[in-house]
């Protein structure tokens, strides 16, 4: 997935999980992107959507990878 595509996913997750500690800065964004960029965008998008629809708390990187 491309960086701009990941940005879209982060915006969606931040809208659903309005917690200031969830991916709080550029450094955190870079770590998350580095660990998820190998996933195809569509696969990551579906995993994020599934998590947002079924979980009360924000995902971890592992949660997204497991659902992908």
State each model region's role.
Residues 1-68:
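Charged interaction scaffolds used for protein-protein
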